[in-house]
Amino acid sequence: MPQNEYIEQHIKQHGRRLDHEERKRKKEAREGHRIAKDAQTLKGWRAKQFAKKRYSEKVAMKKKIKAHQESKVNGPATPKEDDGEALPTYLLDRQTNNTAKAISSSIKQKRLEKADKFSVPLPKVRGISEEEMFKVIKTGKSKHKSWKRMITKHTFVGEGFTRRPVKMERIIRPAALRQKKANVTHPELGVTVFLPILGVKKNPQSPMYTQLGVLTKGTIIEVNVSELGLVTAGGKVVWGKYAQITNEPDRDGCVNAVLLV
C-alpha cells in the first residue's frame, strides 16, 4: 500500500468511530450556518475568493436544475414509428406517444387564458416622480428640519386607521385627500355604481405607494360588489372584485374605475 494512504489503511484495520455517521450528519447540517457566517465576516481577498466560489456553485446548481426540468418535460426518447423495431414484452403496455409535451402545452395555454382573463384596460401609465408625489414639510423650532413628507395624491386608508405620533410620523396622508368610495363601471352591464373601496391591490408606480394606499391612474383596487348581486358558479355571493382606476383622482376629486371581469 502506498505511504500516503495510511488513513484508509487504519480505517480498514480498526474501523470508524461508533458515532461517525452522527458526527458527519451534524457537520453537514452546520455547513449552511458556516457558509452564512463566512459570507458576512470575510474581508478582502478571502471574501473575493469565497464569493467567486459561491457564484460558480450557484451557476452549476441552476444548470443542473434546468437540465433536470427539461428532462422531465421532454421525457424519455420514444421509438420511431417507421423503424419497424418490435417492442419488448415489458414495454407493450406503455404509450408510445409522449404525454409530457401535451401537458406542457396545456399549462402554457392555461397561463395565456389566465393572463387574458386578468388583462387590464390601461396596460401602461405615465410615471410619477417623487417630487410630484411628495411635498417636503419643514419642521422644528427654526423650520430647518426637512425629514417629513406629505403625499399630494389621493389615498385610501382602512377603517381602523390611526395616525402615528406627530414626532414619529414621517409620511403624512392628509384627511382631505382620503377616498373611501369609487365610481365603478361594469364593462359588460354598462352600469356605474358608487362602491366602497376595500383595499389597494397594486400601484404600478412603486410597491411603497401600494403600501401607503396611493390612488393614481392605473392602480388596481379591490371594491365591495355585494350590491351588484354577483354570484359564483356555486351560488355564493361575490364579496370583493378588482377594478382599475381610469382617471386622475387628484385632478377630478373622485375615483373612477372599471371592473375587471
Curated annotation (Swiss-Prot):
- Sequence ranges of Basic and acidic residues compositional bias: 7-36
Gene Ontology biological-process annotations:
maturation of 5.8S rRNA from tricistronic rRNA transcript (SSU-rRNA, 5.8S rRNA, LSU-rRNA); maturation of LSU-rRNA from tricistronic rRNA transcript (SSU-rRNA, 5.8S rRNA, LSU-rRNA)
Q: Where is this motif: Nuclear localization signal 1?
A: 15-22
Keywords of the record, alphabetical order, are: Nucleus, Ribonucleoprotein, Ribosome biogenesis, rRNA processing
CDD domains tied to this protein: NSA2
Q: Which InterPro entries match?
A: NSA2_fam, Ribosomal_Se8/biogenesis_NSA2
Q: At which positions is motif Nuclear localization signal 2?
A: 51-58
What are the start and end residues of every segment in region (Disordered)? 1-36, 62-84
Q: Which Pfam families match?
A: Ribosomal_S8e (PF01201)
Which family is this sequence assigned to?
Answer: Belongs to the eukaryotic ribosomal protein eS8 family. Ribosome biogenesis protein NSA2 subfamily.
Q: What does this protein do?
A: Involved in the biogenesis of the 60S ribosomal subunit. May play a part in the quality control of pre-60S particles.
What is the protein named?
A: Ribosome biogenesis protein NSA2
UniProt gene name: NSA2
